[in-house]
Amino acid sequence: MIWKNYGQRTLLMPAPLLKKISMLKYISVFFLLISSQPSFADTKETYRQLSIFNEVYNRVKDQYVEEVTDKELIEKALNGMLQALDPHSSYMNEEVYKEMQIDTSGSFGGLGIEITTDKGFIKIVSPIDDTPAQKAGVQAGDYITHLDGTSVVDMTLKEAIDIMRGEVGDPITITIVRGTERPFDIEIKRDVIKVQSVKHRIINNVGVLRISTFNEQTTVGLKKSIEELEGSENPPIGYVLDLRNNPGGLLNESVTVSDVFLQKGEIVSIRGREKKDVQVFSAKKGDMINGKPLIILINEGSASASEIVAGALQDHDRAVIMGIKSFGKGSVQTIVPIDSGAVRLTIAKYYPPSGDSIQAVGIIPDVEVPRAELNVIDSYFTFRESDYRDALDNETTDGNEEEEDFNELLENDYQLSRAIDAVKTIAVLN
């Protein structure tokens, strides 16, 4: 999850002075400046460690088999330092930082997958709806072992992303390991990824809200969807909020999405290293669906912001959680701009209202429902000619075609079918 914060700037040393000292001395001063009143012993140990860094740095510069630039070495050193802390901390150079800003705005180029590092490989957290990766059959939990034949063992996320992104239309072959199956190749054509984070449908008088990611457009899109459904001639009797394969996104969006369904109470608390570093986010009065039954669908690809929403609504007994245990990412990152790049740093863990961390544990569903294929529901949430506001009617149809589509959808997506049945049951009991 990203705590969006593009405004911080840190000036470490005046520019003229930087020209007079070596890169190593700059790093040494950096470490000393960020230390809070170090003791003499701490300072001495810091200098000792930096002298080791200096020796290694000079050895690499003088003797490595290929020539490397200072910029390249320093970027790799910074990334190594941060990624050794946890998989979600990293250094972003100017190019990567710009790409990250595009990602959170909702339009970018690539394959359409959220990835992390795990066991030396690249793990797919989830494919994004209606993207080349999702259409090619990539699944949450898949491991990527090769990119165009190049092994990804111990490859950084940045290096993997650099390979996966390229010219629109150019193909890339990724080698996948899925469960106990033998590795297999999938060819995917790169495309511009335009994420419509919220889609909606009414199925059997139940509103189905699909959120694929949490970007700057998510809460606005969710509210518009609910307003449209509630304002229809036959409003839904209840809702299914589908967060399956949603890798997360912006913290503030997870808070405002949760608030759409809550009247009051804590949504999430963010706790940093110090006891005083606690921030609590609470709901404002106003449930947009007026207490109607709500089922939330999750799976192992539901992470971060998805888990905040599911956890908050579960702890307040506002929704029943169905599906499979979620991913278990309970940490918060902040983005700190430095020069033309930025540092992504884990600064806190988040806790649902219960106070129990979900880090590496995940959200446990109230009702466990086995995995279901998502290709049917994802392809169903696409626009057709009939979706246009002023589309011409076909006088020869009687509506049975749409009913058949719904039936086929529910037959192929067992989790969604169970969720819709649950909404109907709760509505009757209420």
What would you call each of these model-derived segments?
Residues 22-29:
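Sec-dependent signal peptide recognition
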Residues 35-36:
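N-terminal signal peptide c-region/cleavage motif recognized by signal peptidases
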Residues 41-49, 53-70, 123-127, 131-140, ...:
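Cleft-lining beta-strand/loop regions that shape enzyme active-site pockets
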Residues 42-55, 61-63, 69, 86-112, ...:
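Glycine-biased strand-turn-strand hairpin within the trypsin-fold
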Residues 64-123, 171-173, 177-187, 195-197, ...:
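Extended, small/polar residue-biased N-terminal targeting/export presequences
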Residues 303, 311, 318-321, 326-328, ...:
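Acidic, polar loop-rich interaction surfaces within structured domains
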Residues 349, 354-430:
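Conserved functional hotspot residues or short segments at active or partner-binding sites
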